[in-house]
């Protein structure tokens, strides 16, 4: 007979999660997650992302007082498409080519949580929207490891994965935390044109092209960002594209929702520089790119022209 832990993992795989792991929230891990976050915040590396200092991020029991286990799941989103080499087009980060990953992953998590709830198990789930250190729990649950560029790398799919977290009041058998396999490699640090990876495992959002093109709401970019965009209009994949794990282990996803929507890989810079509210709604309504508002789209495009 299968244990409840294996039964839950099998159900997660049946629903379509490519990886699933479990961690115990009540043991002392040796990853310095709390002090690392505190140091990152005190250095100002969060820029204006004020939600990053939510106290719940330091103590997961504040999200569920009776928590007994943390389940982390991952979905592979890689497709082999490539950006246009034509300089008139701006580049979009791979994560945003398809349907909004929040919706895709949330649908699967809701099915998973409903199945658990029907067995009397309490759950709370998050998809990049709550005060949870998803990457930390992914490493603790054996799903992957936090790399030098701050992304989670899995042995099976590289770093092209979306993460979801389920908190539960059921005590389950934990997986072994994942070891780090970056070794002495520093390709991600060396490729970054703005030196946003200030040292291994620490990213200064203020210098990150992805942060600036997606989260930065200011009217203009600092010169060190503007001069190094190199066509990036929404996000940046440079530190992932050079990663040896991605070059070797990227696998095409079996989730059709993650395949590129028409025109989402590369965008005409002149068109985007004159984007209207109606065009924005029509083009990005089903995409995670809708997080970038019209004014920011125009700014991003003009900075590349």
Curated annotation (Swiss-Prot):
Pathway: tRNA modification; tRNA-queuosine biosynthesis. GO terms for biological process: queuosine biosynthetic process; tRNA modification. Its EC number is 1.17.99.6. InterPro entries: 4Fe4S_Fe-S-bd, 4Fe4S_Fe_S_CS, QueG, QueG_DUF1730. The active site is at residue 128. [4Fe-4S] cluster 1 binds at residues 182, 185, 188, 243. Disulfide bonds: none annotated. GO terms for molecular function: 4 iron, 4 sulfur cluster binding; epoxyqueuosine reductase activity; metal ion binding. It is an enzyme of class 1 (oxidoreductase). Binds 2 [4Fe-4S] clusters per monomer. Keywords: 4Fe-4S, Cytoplasm, Iron, Iron-sulfur, Metal-binding, Oxidoreductase, Queuosine biosynthesis, tRNA processing. Residues 170-202 form the 4Fe-4S ferredoxin-type domain. Pfam families: Fer4_16, QueG_DUF1730. Gene3D superfamilies: 3.30.70.20. Coiled coil: none annotated. Its cofactor is cob(II)alamin; [4Fe-4S] cluster. Monomer. This is Epoxyqueuosine reductase.
